[in-house]
Amino acid sequence: MARILIVDDDRDLLDGQQAFLESKGYEVQTAAGMDEGLAKLSGFEPDLILADLMMEHYDTGFVFCKKVRELPGLKNVPILMQTAAPKEIGFTLDSHSEKARGWMKVDEVLTKPVPLEDLLGKIEQYLSR
């Protein structure tokens, strides 16, 4: 089954999504921040990455995604960004345009909380490409 890396500073979210995705047969690794996430990538090659936007700083997710895209072999790995920014600061991120996806270095932005079945649907959508 596919391998997924989840990078988020919310331990409850990490644990919940990991348990759910593992119950669906996915191999899941988690990281509690950007540095830990980048370190995990040295020994774990995910088929998809779920990354939070606001971790250590408001833009940490963007920095993480940019660094991932610079790593050999990970340029085309789907990255789904999860964020509560629309609810927390009223800032909406639209990943529907090619230009927006280009500067964000993500394939799609999902607004937290993401219902687990919806998350599974998105994961399956991107992994089937």
PLM regions and their residue ranges:
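Two-component/phosphorelay signaling modules centered on CheY-like receiver
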Residues: R11-Q29, Y126
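Active-site residues of response regulator receiver
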Residues: D52-L53, T83
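Receiver (REC) domain switch/output surface
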Residues: P115-R129
